[in-house]
Amino acid sequence: MTTVLVAGATGNVGGEVVRALAGAGEVRALSRRGTPVAGAVPLAGDLSDRAAVADAWRGVDAVFLPAGHPDVPGLLADMRTAGVRRVVLLSTGAVVRGDVDNAVTRFNLVSEAAVRDSGIGWTVLRPSGFMSNALQWAPLADVVREPFADVPVAVIDPADIGAVAARALTDPGLEGQSLRLTGPEATLPADRLAVLGEVLGRDLRLEPEPDDEARARLGSAMPAEYVDAFFRFFRGGEYDDSRVTTTVPDLLGRPARTFRQWSEVHAGAF
């Protein structure tokens, strides 16, 4: 029986990976607090503390790993020593430019390189922006202020990422591949808000957030180099996240999920 460990198992993507692995063998759900996750054995551990998670890899065949942790090469070395045979890395589509001067691109590229050099079988997932980012609108009233309101993105349902990850974790045929994953169409924030409003039966309206206000607000929640990275992506034109690929339907044998489908599933969060 295959044993799979999902790191970041309580996150938007990690939780979907756990759900998609139902019936595929033993699933271990690693999170900082060891929060119980349906269908998995909970484990507590922080990936920023290599020693604290060293025992977690024992008896594990495959690992789902989000990019960006401080010592990814060290984590991978411990996995290899423990006998892990396959790693599926959650990266980003932004790496395609290979721009190491961009902080977001850089930490994902570093993680990708570490996985490729680890000696473990690997698959890299490079998704577009997540539909679940709309959950940030939940605490707001019927007027939503949104940065980069004029930038279309082919947003993807994390459930589709989870389904592809589950396949990569259990199917050696996807080893050695970097998979660009997107939703079925490129949409503007106002388009997505309109769909959400229809699903909720509310008259929701989007107000573009001025760049200076967006920069200040984002800067209160993340390091300045990451704020700069997003402005370089969406104002500097360094990353086109509107391109649609067929990877999800090609691998899953069904269409990629729409934002309406995502909204119907998550309507209760609003």
Show the residue positions of the predicted features.
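Oxidoreductase cofactor-interface core, primarily capturing Rossmann-like NAD(P)-dependent enzymes
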Residues: T2-R33, V37-A38, S48-A51, R58-V60, ...
